[in-house]
């Protein structure tokens, strides 16, 4: 939508504890800090929460392998259960991970009562080089809310990973 065009989000990831997130709102010409209490809130009226768009550090979750499956194309996918160690809007997530890309291609999100809340389907993968590693990241996520029947699509036109910043690159207002 026009009123959210140019919105930018900055996430400072922490291995443990809540990430720091800020949102630049061009229509207001201001930066808004996202409090940890707001992580479960809807991101700009969409089916995504701020938690969905934050870091997915493995140290923040307990994992349990469920099974391996073969896709119709013959690729191996891992099915994992992921439970948050900290307070979350979700009781668990069932993740489908592509062995080839080592990245999630689908996540089922369960609400705090244990009911299926929404499903995220990840697509348009691009490969990035970070240091000496090559990693895949989706440039499109479609989030379908099972309970409300609403859906939202999130796309990245530009993404930079592994960027080194100096503290003077940012200022607090």
What is each residue range found by the language model?
Residues 10, 20, 30, 34, ...:
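Gly/Pro-enriched, hydrophobic low-complexity segments
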Residues 58-68:
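Surface-exposed, charged, gly/pro-rich loop-and-adjacent secondary-structure segments at domain edges
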Residues 1-26:
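N-terminal mature ectodomain segment of secretory-pathway/periplasmic proteins
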């Amino acid at each position: 939508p026009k009123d959210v065009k140019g919105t930018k989000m900055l996430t400072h990831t922490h291995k443990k504890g809540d990430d720091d997130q800020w949102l630049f709102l061009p229509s207001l010409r201001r930066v808004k800090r996202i409090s940890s209490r707001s992580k479960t809130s809807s991101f700009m009226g969409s089916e995504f929460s701020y938690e969905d768009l934050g870091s997915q550090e493995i140290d923040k979750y307990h994992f349990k392998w469920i099974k391996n499956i073969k896709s119709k194309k013959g690729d191996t996918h891992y099915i994992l259960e992921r439970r948050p160690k900290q307070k979350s809007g979700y009781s668990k997530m069932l993740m489908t991970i592509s062995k080839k890309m080592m990245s999630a291609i689908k996540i089922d999100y369960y609400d705090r009562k244990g009911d299926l809340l929404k499903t995220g389907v990840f697509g348009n993968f691009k490969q990035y080089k970070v240091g000496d590693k090559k990693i895949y990241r989706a440039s499109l996520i479609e989030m379908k809310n099972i309970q409300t029947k609403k859906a939202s699509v999130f796309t990245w036109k530009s993404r930079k990973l592994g960027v080194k910043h100096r503290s003077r690159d940012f200022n607090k207002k």
